Amino acid sequence: MGCFHSTGSEAKKRSKLIDEQLRHDHERCVGEIKLLLLGAGESGKSTIVRQMRILHETGFNKQEQMAYRPVVFSNMVQSMLAILKAMQPLNISFTDAAREEDARMFISHFLHVNNAELSEAFSLELSDLMKQLWMDEGVKKCVKRAHEYQLNDSAEYYFNALDRISSSSYLPTQDDILRARVKSTGIVETTFMYKDLCFKMFDVGGQRSERKKWIHCFDSVTAVIFCVALSEYDLRLAEDQTMNRMHESMQLFDSIVNNCWFTETSIILFLNKMDIFEERIRYTPLTVCFPEYQGGMTITETSTFIQSRFEILNKRQTPAQKEIYSHFTCATDTNNIRFVFDAVTDIIIRNNLYLCGLY
Protein backbone atom coordinates (compact mmCIF):
# COMPACT_ATOMS: atom_id res chain seq x y z
CA MET A 1 0.00 0.00 0.00
CA GLY A 2 2.86 2.32 0.98
CA CYS A 3 4.68 1.43 -2.24
CA PHE A 4 1.56 2.24 -4.28
CA HIS A 5 1.20 5.58 -2.47
CA SER A 6 4.82 6.43 -3.22
CA THR A 7 4.41 5.60 -6.93
CA GLY A 8 1.25 7.72 -7.10
CA SER A 9 3.04 10.65 -5.49
CA GLU A 10 5.88 10.39 -8.01
CA ALA A 11 3.39 10.33 -10.87
CA LYS A 12 1.68 13.44 -9.51
CA LYS A 13 5.03 15.23 -9.20
CA ARG A 14 5.96 14.30 -12.77
CA SER A 15 2.54 15.44 -14.01
CA LYS A 16 2.92 18.73 -12.17
CA LEU A 17 6.40 19.26 -13.63
CA ILE A 18 5.09 18.51 -17.13
CA ASP A 19 2.20 20.95 -16.65
CA GLU A 20 4.59 23.64 -15.45
CA GLN A 21 6.90 23.03 -18.41
CA LEU A 22 3.98 23.20 -20.86
CA ARG A 23 2.82 26.44 -19.26
CA HIS A 24 6.35 27.83 -19.47
CA ASP A 25 6.63 26.77 -23.14
CA HIS A 26 3.22 28.31 -23.84
CA GLU A 27 4.26 31.63 -22.28
CA ARG A 28 7.59 31.58 -24.10
CA CYS A 29 5.93 30.75 -27.40
CA VAL A 30 2.85 32.96 -27.22
CA GLY A 31 3.83 35.58 -24.57
CA GLU A 32 3.85 38.71 -26.77
CA ILE A 33 1.52 39.00 -29.73
CA LYS A 34 2.68 41.33 -32.49
CA LEU A 35 -0.17 42.33 -34.80
CA LEU A 36 0.42 44.21 -38.03
CA LEU A 37 -2.67 46.10 -39.16
CA LEU A 38 -2.51 46.58 -42.93
CA GLY A 39 -4.83 47.67 -45.72
CA ALA A 40 -5.44 50.45 -48.20
CA GLY A 41 -6.32 53.96 -47.06
CA GLU A 42 -9.71 54.47 -45.38
CA SER A 43 -10.28 50.75 -44.82
CA GLY A 44 -10.94 51.21 -41.09
CA LYS A 45 -7.58 50.31 -39.55
CA SER A 46 -7.39 53.28 -37.19
CA THR A 47 -10.96 52.62 -36.04
CA ILE A 48 -9.93 49.08 -35.06
CA VAL A 49 -7.08 50.53 -32.98
CA ARG A 50 -9.49 52.90 -31.22
CA GLN A 51 -11.76 49.94 -30.48
CA MET A 52 -8.85 48.16 -28.80
CA ARG A 53 -8.42 51.17 -26.51
CA ILE A 54 -12.12 51.07 -25.66
CA LEU A 55 -12.30 47.30 -25.17
CA HIS A 56 -8.93 46.53 -23.56
CA GLU A 57 -7.71 49.79 -22.03
CA THR A 58 -9.56 52.66 -20.36
CA GLY A 59 -10.98 54.25 -23.48
CA PHE A 60 -10.60 58.00 -23.93
CA ASN A 61 -10.33 60.46 -21.04
CA LYS A 62 -11.84 63.95 -21.14
CA GLN A 63 -8.64 65.57 -22.37
CA GLU A 64 -8.41 63.08 -25.24
CA GLN A 65 -12.09 63.56 -26.04
CA MET A 66 -11.52 67.32 -26.21
CA ALA A 67 -8.62 66.73 -28.60
CA TYR A 68 -11.07 65.16 -31.05
CA ARG A 69 -13.28 68.29 -31.20
CA PRO A 70 -11.28 69.99 -33.98
CA VAL A 71 -11.06 66.64 -35.80
CA VAL A 72 -14.85 66.27 -35.82
CA PHE A 73 -15.32 69.93 -36.80
CA SER A 74 -12.77 69.60 -39.60
CA ASN A 75 -14.38 66.37 -40.84
CA MET A 76 -17.75 68.12 -41.04
CA VAL A 77 -16.41 71.19 -42.82
CA GLN A 78 -14.43 69.12 -45.32
CA SER A 79 -17.46 66.92 -45.96
CA MET A 80 -19.78 69.88 -46.58
CA LEU A 81 -17.21 71.49 -48.87
CA ALA A 82 -16.86 68.23 -50.82
CA ILE A 83 -20.65 67.97 -51.21
CA LEU A 84 -21.10 71.58 -52.33
CA LYS A 85 -18.24 71.37 -54.83
CA ALA A 86 -19.61 68.09 -56.26
CA MET A 87 -23.15 69.35 -56.89
CA GLN A 88 -22.43 71.29 -60.08
CA PRO A 89 -20.37 68.57 -61.84
CA LEU A 90 -23.09 66.05 -60.91
CA ASN A 91 -25.75 68.44 -62.23
CA ILE A 92 -27.57 68.57 -58.88
CA SER A 93 -29.43 71.74 -57.89
CA PHE A 94 -30.53 73.00 -54.50
CA THR A 95 -34.22 72.42 -53.82
CA ASP A 96 -34.40 75.91 -52.30
CA ALA A 97 -32.66 78.57 -54.41
CA ALA A 98 -31.79 80.50 -51.23
CA ARG A 99 -29.24 77.81 -50.42
CA GLU A 100 -27.07 79.02 -53.33
CA GLU A 101 -26.09 82.08 -51.32
CA ASP A 102 -25.62 79.95 -48.18
CA ALA A 103 -23.25 77.70 -50.12
CA ARG A 104 -21.23 80.68 -51.40
CA MET A 105 -20.94 82.08 -47.88
CA PHE A 106 -19.87 78.71 -46.48
CA ILE A 107 -17.20 78.12 -49.14
CA SER A 108 -15.93 81.70 -48.85
CA HIS A 109 -15.65 81.44 -45.05
CA PHE A 110 -13.37 78.40 -45.23
CA LEU A 111 -11.09 79.47 -48.06
CA HIS A 112 -8.44 80.64 -45.57
CA VAL A 113 -9.33 78.72 -42.41
CA ASN A 114 -7.00 75.98 -41.15
CA ASN A 115 -7.77 73.11 -38.78
CA ALA A 116 -6.25 74.93 -35.79
CA GLU A 117 -8.99 77.56 -36.07
CA LEU A 118 -11.66 74.87 -35.75
CA SER A 119 -10.77 73.98 -32.16
CA GLU A 120 -13.64 76.02 -30.73
CA ALA A 121 -17.34 75.38 -31.23
CA PHE A 122 -18.95 76.39 -34.51
CA SER A 123 -20.26 79.95 -34.43
CA LEU A 124 -24.03 80.36 -34.36
CA GLU A 125 -23.92 81.76 -37.90
CA LEU A 126 -21.87 78.83 -39.17
CA SER A 127 -23.97 76.16 -37.50
CA ASP A 128 -27.14 77.78 -38.90
CA LEU A 129 -25.60 77.78 -42.37
CA MET A 130 -24.74 74.08 -42.12
CA LYS A 131 -28.20 73.22 -40.80
CA GLN A 132 -29.90 75.05 -43.67
CA LEU A 133 -27.66 73.36 -46.22
CA TRP A 134 -28.10 69.92 -44.68
CA MET A 135 -31.90 70.25 -44.74
CA ASP A 136 -31.87 70.82 -48.50
CA GLU A 137 -32.92 67.75 -50.49
CA GLY A 138 -30.41 68.60 -53.22
CA VAL A 139 -27.56 68.28 -50.71
CA LYS A 140 -28.88 64.92 -49.51
CA LYS A 141 -29.23 63.75 -53.10
CA CYS A 142 -25.57 64.59 -53.63
CA VAL A 143 -24.63 62.55 -50.54
CA LYS A 144 -26.41 59.53 -52.05
CA ARG A 145 -24.06 59.83 -55.04
CA ALA A 146 -20.93 59.97 -52.87
CA HIS A 147 -19.42 57.07 -54.85
CA GLU A 148 -18.88 59.59 -57.68
CA TYR A 149 -16.56 61.81 -55.63
CA GLN A 150 -14.55 61.69 -52.37
CA LEU A 151 -16.72 61.97 -49.22
CA ASN A 152 -16.00 60.79 -45.67
CA ASP A 153 -18.12 57.82 -44.54
CA SER A 154 -18.99 59.73 -41.38
CA ALA A 155 -20.56 62.73 -43.14
CA GLU A 156 -24.21 61.74 -42.75
CA TYR A 157 -23.69 60.59 -39.14
CA TYR A 158 -22.17 63.93 -38.11
CA PHE A 159 -24.66 66.13 -39.98
CA ASN A 160 -27.57 64.29 -38.40
CA ALA A 161 -26.05 65.20 -35.00
CA LEU A 162 -25.40 68.84 -35.92
CA ASP A 163 -27.47 70.30 -33.05
CA ARG A 164 -25.46 68.35 -30.47
CA ILE A 165 -22.08 68.92 -32.11
CA SER A 166 -22.60 72.67 -32.58
CA SER A 167 -23.25 73.14 -28.84
CA SER A 168 -20.62 75.24 -27.02
CA SER A 169 -20.28 72.43 -24.43
CA TYR A 170 -19.81 69.72 -27.05
CA LEU A 171 -17.62 66.80 -25.94
CA PRO A 172 -17.07 64.07 -28.56
CA THR A 173 -18.68 60.78 -27.60
CA GLN A 174 -17.16 57.35 -28.07
CA ASP A 175 -19.13 56.94 -31.32
CA ASP A 176 -18.01 60.37 -32.55
CA ILE A 177 -14.38 59.41 -31.96
CA LEU A 178 -14.75 56.04 -33.67
CA ARG A 179 -16.08 57.79 -36.78
CA ALA A 180 -13.48 60.57 -36.85
CA ARG A 181 -11.32 60.52 -39.95
CA VAL A 182 -7.62 61.15 -39.32
CA LYS A 183 -5.22 60.20 -42.09
CA SER A 184 -2.68 57.69 -40.75
CA THR A 185 0.93 58.72 -41.33
CA GLY A 186 3.90 56.68 -40.23
CA ILE A 187 3.46 53.80 -37.79
CA VAL A 188 1.35 53.99 -34.63
CA GLU A 189 1.93 51.36 -31.92
CA THR A 190 -0.75 50.44 -29.39
CA THR A 191 -0.03 48.04 -26.50
CA PHE A 192 -2.72 46.32 -24.42
CA MET A 193 -3.31 43.18 -22.35
CA TYR A 194 -5.96 40.60 -23.22
CA LYS A 195 -6.34 36.99 -22.01
CA ASP A 196 -3.07 37.37 -20.06
CA LEU A 197 -1.22 38.19 -23.27
CA CYS A 198 0.59 41.36 -24.23
CA PHE A 199 -0.59 42.62 -27.62
CA LYS A 200 1.38 45.10 -29.67
CA MET A 201 -0.71 46.39 -32.56
CA PHE A 202 0.91 48.43 -35.33
CA ASP A 203 -1.31 50.66 -37.46
CA VAL A 204 0.40 51.67 -40.70
CA GLY A 205 -0.68 54.41 -43.10
CA GLY A 206 -2.57 52.89 -46.03
CA GLN A 207 -2.01 55.46 -48.76
CA ARG A 208 0.53 54.47 -51.39
CA SER A 209 3.09 56.99 -50.14
CA GLU A 210 3.01 55.39 -46.66
CA ARG A 211 3.51 51.75 -47.67
CA LYS A 212 7.29 51.91 -47.99
CA LYS A 213 7.36 52.16 -44.19
CA TRP A 214 5.74 48.74 -43.71
CA ILE A 215 8.93 46.76 -44.24
CA HIS A 216 10.27 47.92 -40.85
CA CYS A 217 7.36 46.19 -39.09
CA PHE A 218 7.73 42.76 -40.66
CA ASP A 219 10.15 41.22 -38.17
CA SER A 220 8.64 38.60 -35.82
CA VAL A 221 5.03 39.37 -36.72
CA THR A 222 2.56 36.99 -35.06
CA ALA A 223 -0.38 37.86 -37.30
CA VAL A 224 -1.39 40.25 -40.04
CA ILE A 225 -4.86 41.75 -39.88
CA PHE A 226 -5.66 43.01 -43.37
CA CYS A 227 -8.60 45.42 -43.59
CA VAL A 228 -10.74 45.82 -46.69
CA ALA A 229 -13.63 48.26 -46.96
CA LEU A 230 -16.40 46.27 -48.66
CA SER A 231 -18.10 49.56 -49.48
CA GLU A 232 -15.20 50.68 -51.68
CA TYR A 233 -16.19 48.44 -54.61
CA ASP A 234 -17.60 51.43 -56.53
CA LEU A 235 -15.03 54.04 -55.42
CA ARG A 236 -11.78 55.38 -56.86
CA LEU A 237 -8.55 56.05 -54.98
CA ALA A 238 -8.14 59.56 -53.60
CA GLU A 239 -4.52 59.52 -54.84
CA ASP A 240 -5.29 57.91 -58.24
CA GLN A 241 -8.72 58.54 -59.77
CA THR A 242 -8.13 55.89 -62.45
CA MET A 243 -7.84 53.05 -59.91
CA ASN A 244 -10.80 51.24 -58.36
CA ARG A 245 -10.27 50.98 -54.59
CA MET A 246 -11.32 47.33 -54.36
CA HIS A 247 -8.89 46.35 -57.13
CA GLU A 248 -6.14 48.26 -55.33
CA SER A 249 -6.92 46.38 -52.10
CA MET A 250 -6.81 43.05 -53.93
CA GLN A 251 -3.39 43.83 -55.41
CA LEU A 252 -2.13 44.88 -52.01
CA PHE A 253 -3.55 41.77 -50.31
CA ASP A 254 -1.91 39.58 -52.97
CA SER A 255 1.48 41.15 -52.23
CA ILE A 256 1.01 40.64 -48.47
CA VAL A 257 -0.46 37.14 -48.28
CA ASN A 258 2.20 35.70 -50.61
CA ASN A 259 5.11 37.63 -49.12
CA CYS A 260 8.04 35.48 -47.95
CA TRP A 261 8.10 37.44 -44.67
CA PHE A 262 4.75 35.92 -43.72
CA THR A 263 5.20 32.20 -44.45
CA GLU A 264 4.54 31.32 -40.79
CA THR A 265 2.25 34.24 -39.99
CA SER A 266 -1.49 33.99 -39.43
CA ILE A 267 -3.35 36.05 -42.03
CA ILE A 268 -6.65 37.48 -40.84
CA LEU A 269 -8.94 39.26 -43.30
CA PHE A 270 -11.36 41.88 -41.99
CA LEU A 271 -14.03 42.55 -44.63
CA ASN A 272 -15.02 45.83 -43.07
CA LYS A 273 -17.73 48.51 -43.38
CA MET A 274 -20.43 45.88 -43.74
CA ASP A 275 -23.07 48.43 -42.71
CA ILE A 276 -22.19 50.87 -45.50
CA PHE A 277 -21.87 48.04 -48.02
CA GLU A 278 -25.34 46.77 -47.12
CA GLU A 279 -26.78 50.19 -47.93
CA ARG A 280 -24.76 50.78 -51.09
CA ILE A 281 -25.34 47.39 -52.72
CA ARG A 282 -29.05 48.23 -52.92
CA TYR A 283 -28.51 50.76 -55.70
CA THR A 284 -25.03 50.11 -57.14
CA PRO A 285 -24.51 46.64 -58.69
CA LEU A 286 -21.40 44.64 -57.83
CA THR A 287 -20.67 44.32 -61.56
CA VAL A 288 -19.21 47.86 -61.58
CA CYS A 289 -16.20 46.28 -59.87
CA PHE A 290 -16.54 42.62 -60.88
CA PRO A 291 -18.05 42.41 -64.41
CA GLU A 292 -17.88 38.60 -64.20
CA TYR A 293 -20.27 38.47 -61.24
CA GLN A 294 -23.52 36.66 -62.10
CA GLY A 295 -25.06 36.13 -58.66
CA GLY A 296 -27.92 37.89 -56.94
CA MET A 297 -27.81 41.25 -55.22
CA THR A 298 -28.41 40.07 -51.64
CA ILE A 299 -25.93 41.12 -48.98
CA THR A 300 -24.97 37.48 -48.35
CA GLU A 301 -24.30 36.62 -52.00
CA THR A 302 -22.35 39.76 -52.81
CA SER A 303 -20.21 39.86 -49.65
CA THR A 304 -19.40 36.15 -49.95
CA PHE A 305 -18.32 36.68 -53.56
CA ILE A 306 -15.92 39.47 -52.55
CA GLN A 307 -14.56 37.23 -49.78
CA SER A 308 -13.86 34.48 -52.33
CA ARG A 309 -12.06 36.97 -54.65
CA PHE A 310 -9.60 37.77 -51.86
CA GLU A 311 -9.14 34.23 -50.53
CA ILE A 312 -8.36 32.87 -54.00
CA LEU A 313 -5.32 35.16 -54.15
CA ASN A 314 -3.61 33.05 -51.48
CA LYS A 315 -0.91 30.93 -53.17
CA ARG A 316 0.64 29.53 -49.97
CA GLN A 317 0.89 25.77 -50.25
CA THR A 318 1.23 24.01 -46.89
CA PRO A 319 -1.94 23.17 -44.91
CA ALA A 320 -0.79 25.26 -41.94
CA GLN A 321 -0.25 28.30 -44.16
CA LYS A 322 -3.12 27.94 -46.57
CA GLU A 323 -6.08 29.13 -44.51
CA ILE A 324 -7.16 32.76 -44.50
CA TYR A 325 -9.26 33.63 -41.45
CA SER A 326 -11.98 35.93 -42.78
CA HIS A 327 -14.44 37.97 -40.73
CA PHE A 328 -17.16 40.40 -41.78
CA THR A 329 -16.84 43.47 -39.59
CA CYS A 330 -18.26 46.87 -38.81
CA ALA A 331 -15.35 48.67 -37.15
CA THR A 332 -17.58 51.33 -35.58
CA ASP A 333 -19.67 48.64 -33.81
CA THR A 334 -17.95 47.90 -30.49
CA ASN A 335 -19.91 44.70 -29.82
CA ASN A 336 -19.06 43.33 -33.26
CA ILE A 337 -15.34 44.03 -32.82
CA ARG A 338 -15.39 42.55 -29.30
CA PHE A 339 -16.79 39.28 -30.66
CA VAL A 340 -14.50 39.16 -33.70
CA PHE A 341 -11.31 40.00 -31.79
CA ASP A 342 -12.06 37.29 -29.24
CA ALA A 343 -12.23 34.75 -32.09
CA VAL A 344 -9.09 36.21 -33.67
CA THR A 345 -7.16 35.86 -30.40
CA ASP A 346 -8.08 32.18 -30.12
CA ILE A 347 -6.89 31.60 -33.69
CA ILE A 348 -3.58 33.34 -33.01
CA ILE A 349 -2.93 31.37 -29.82
CA ARG A 350 -3.79 28.06 -31.48
CA ASN A 351 -1.58 28.74 -34.51
CA ASN A 352 1.34 29.82 -32.34
CA LEU A 353 1.09 26.67 -30.25
CA TYR A 354 0.96 24.62 -33.46
CA LEU A 355 4.14 26.25 -34.76
CA CYS A 356 5.82 25.56 -31.40
CA GLY A 357 4.74 21.91 -31.52
CA LEU A 358 2.46 22.32 -28.51
CA TYR A 359 -0.88 21.88 -30.25
UniProtKB/Swiss-Prot annotation:
Expressed in ASI neurons. Residues 199-208 are annotated as: G3 motif. Residues 329-334 are annotated as: G5 motif. CDD domains: G-alpha (cd00066). One of its GO terms (molecular function) is GTPase activity. Mg(2+) binds at S46. GO terms for biological process: adenylate cyclase-modulating G protein-coupled receptor signaling pathway. Residues 268-275 are annotated as: G4 motif. Residues 176-184 are annotated as: G2 motif. Residues 34-47 are annotated as: G1 motif. Transmembrane segments: none annotated. A lipid is attached at G2 (N-myristoyl glycine). One of its GO terms (cellular component) is non-motile cilium. Keywords: GTP-binding, Lipoprotein, Magnesium, Metal-binding, Myristate, Nucleotide-binding, Palmitate, Transducer. GTP binds at residues 39-46, 178-184, 203-207, 272-275, 331. PROSITE patterns: G_ALPHA (PS51882). Signal peptide: none annotated. It holds the Pfam family G-alpha. Belongs to the G-alpha family. G(i/o/t/z) subfamily. G proteins are composed of 3 units; alpha, beta and gamma. The alpha chain contains the guanine nucleotide binding site. This is Guanine nucleotide-binding protein alpha-4 subunit. It comes from Caenorhabditis elegans.
